[in-house]
Amino acid sequence: MIAPDEGRRDVAALKAALRKSAKAALAAVTPERRAVASADAAARASAHPAWPGAELVLAFLSMPSEIDTAPVVEAALAAGKRVAVPRIDGGDIAFVELAPDWRAWPRDRWDIPAPPAEAPSIPPAEIAGLATLALVPGLAFDRTGGRLGRGKGYYDRFLASVAAARSAAAARSSGPSSPFVAIGYGYESQIVDS
């Protein structure tokens, strides 16, 4: 029988190995492949069944090694959707509505345009009340909706907070809630077996 601590260490070691492998694969993506894959991903996102009704698109601004989200952000803005991107606030992420000058935002330590600290965030309760399509980053994804992030748990906590806000809103109301659809957003090569 495996001791619980030993099992957790095995899972942690497996996740660490998968993260290392995924980061190496991302670093090997050529600029040409990134551009083609980014345009393809934006086309797939805008063809997703949740896209037409989405009032809000939660996107992320890409690290240089990640799939480029600029094409999907521009498509959402062109479609008249609100777009919000994450900002790290303490140990959590908060989503900030994208400003027209977002490309001029100063870059953070990950070389990502950083939303200004003074920009107001959209509370999870407000997000829960909007038809939302969330494009979630990760290092690896499986076909059942699982994802392996970078290990800080930012998105896990955020998605849990929106789920809690949606549950609370549903308990107060008998009407249907606005849909919230989260999809892993990355390269097809980031899809792994469960």
What name fits each language-model region?
Residues 44, 147-148:
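Short linear sequence motifs
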Residues 1-13, 17, 24-28, 79, ...:
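Surface-exposed, charge/polar-rich loops and edge strands
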Residues 71, 154-157:
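Non-catalytic alpha-helical scaffold/packing segments enriched in small hydrophobic residues
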Residues 40, 137-140:
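Short, charged low-complexity linear motifs
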Residues 2-130:
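N-terminal active-site beta-alpha-beta segment that forms phosphate/nucleotide-binding
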Residues 63-65, 139-143:
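Short glycine-rich anion-binding loops that position phosphate/pyrophosphate groups of nucleotides
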